[in-house]
């Protein structure tokens, strides 16, 4: 849903299907939740020993809530499920995933609208996205990432965002990250 300049996964914006609407594009591999489970279950003992599991990330995993719910039904509670998300989904979708997802990593870009809109090329509200997360998920299950984005923000603006997120939303686990630009 976002169009971030430095997105490391440009493929998430490419079509899955060819123009006929049925044929899958080259390089795309469609998996059911069961097929994915069968691939990653090789790490079952490791996940159980470490308290680990699987992380669904970008593109935007909240675009596929049914897939995530089905995967949880297959793997059960023995694995942790984490979402790394930009939070661009409806309140209802996030709510439907509350009991399925153990941890949320929210990549918020910036709470300053001008920075957020310029970088993501969208008109979503980062404040509204954080507000819905606060209403739904206990803070101990949330990490908020605020990246330093070259040519878009500064260390100071990120520090400001982190302080405001803590103050306005009460999230304690807010971290500054540095984007590694892949060209």
Model-identified regions with their sequence ranges:
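Canonical Radical SAM [4Fe-4S] cluster-binding loop centered on the CxxxCxxC motif
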Residues: 1-30
């Amino acid at each position: 849903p976002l169009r971030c300049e430095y997105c490391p996964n440009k493929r998430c914006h490419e079509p899955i299907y060819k123009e006929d609407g049925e044929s899958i594009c080259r390089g795309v591999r469609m998996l059911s939740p069961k097929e994915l489970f069968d691939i990653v279950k090789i790490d079952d003992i490791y996940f159980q020993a470490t308290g680990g599991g699987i992380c669904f990330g970008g593109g935007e995993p909240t675009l596929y809530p049914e897939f995530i719910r089905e995967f949880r039904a297959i793997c059960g509670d023995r694995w942790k499920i984490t979402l790394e998300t930009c939070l661009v989904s409806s309140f209802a979708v996030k709510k439907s995933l509350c009991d399925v997802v153990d941890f949320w990593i929210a990549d918020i870009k910036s709470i300053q609208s001008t920075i957020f809109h310029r970088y993501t090329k969208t008109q979503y509200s980062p404040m509204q996205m954080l507000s819905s997360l606060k209403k739904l998920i206990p803070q101990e299950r949330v990490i908020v990432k605020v990246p330093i984005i070259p040519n878009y923000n500064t260390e100071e603006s990120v520090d400001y965002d982190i302080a405001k997120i803590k103050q306005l939303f009460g999230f304690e686990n807010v971290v500054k990250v540095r984007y590694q630009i892949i060209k």
